Design a protein with these regions (language model features):
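PRPP-associated nucleotide enzymes
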Residues: 1-159
């Protein structure tokens, strides 16, 4: 079977939901200076945290590859994640960041797989709850491919 990508969340739905999340976050943080921590390939304040190797399953071992360059004490912090699966990475990260004494700390994710959760993390802003499938597009990749797709999709035909 040839490898294909099936659309799970169309481009228009992704754009609409991101706009809605942005409006809600702007409303919730009105008059405050929010410090974003993006657990992605890039962000405002960048922190690289991973529990994935080269495969499609979490390794279960969380590593911090790059830490923050500034203090969080007394600051309103919003962690932005692309996808939450088992919750291990975010549980570990939020525990570390809580010890740095932020004034507040909330979590935003574009995609959430609550049925895969093995660590309890409170997600304050969710784009989409999705089924337990390996997804690509909109920044998410499979073996360094499909990252630039404008929609969220599921790779089919992969063992």
């Amino acid at each position: 079977m040839a490898e294909t990508v099936k659309v799970l969340v169309p481009e228009e739905d992704v754009a609409k939901r991101i706009k809605e999340l942005g409006e809600q976050i702007s409303k919730d943080y009105a008059g405050k200076q929010v410090h974003l921590i993006c657990v992605l390939k890039g962000g405002v304040y960048f922190m690289s945290v991973s529990s994935y190797g080269d495969g499609t399953k979490s390794s279960g071992v969380v590593k911090i590859a790059k830490d923050l360059d500034e203090t969080l004490e007394g600051k309103d912090v919003l962690i932005v994640e692309d996808i939450i699966d088992s919750g291990r990475t975010l549980y570990y990260l939020m525990d570390i960041l809580a010890k740095r004494k932020p004034k507040s700390m909330k979590l935003c994710t574009l995609l959430d797989k609550p049925e895969r959760r093995v660590k309890d993390v409170k997600v304050d802003y969710v784009g989409f709850n999705i089924p337990d499938e390996f997804v690509v597009g909109y920044g998410l990749d499979y073996a360094q491919r499909y990252r630039n797709l404008p929609f969220i999709g599921v790779v089919e035909g992969v063992e």
